[in-house]
Amino acid sequence: MLNPSIDSLLQKIDSKYTLVTVAAKRAREMQLANNCVVEKPVSHKCVGKALEEIDAEALSYVPSEDKVAE
């Protein structure tokens, strides 16, 4: 079972694809700098820690105004 739940995460970020992108970028930052904002993360992996940061609202993103041309 995923902790935090996908439903909880999708309340914070509107799209599954955006959620994956934000979490992956943050996980990469954590691998390089070894800094986690959450006090006692449940997960020991960087992606899990990034998802916990998103769920705790310690990590946010600003959506780009650029739209893909259709």
Swiss-Prot record:
It catalyses: RNA(n) + a ribonucleoside 5'-triphosphate = RNA(n+1) + diphosphate. GO terms for molecular function: bacterial-type RNA polymerase core enzyme binding; DNA binding; DNA-directed RNA polymerase activity. Keywords: DNA-directed RNA polymerase, Nucleotidyltransferase, Transcription, Transferase. One of its GO terms (biological process) is DNA-templated transcription initiation. Promotes RNA polymerase assembly. Latches the N- and C-terminal regions of the beta' subunit thereby facilitating its interaction with the beta and alpha subunits. Belongs to the RNA polymerase subunit omega family. This is DNA-directed RNA polymerase subunit omega. The gene is rpoZ.
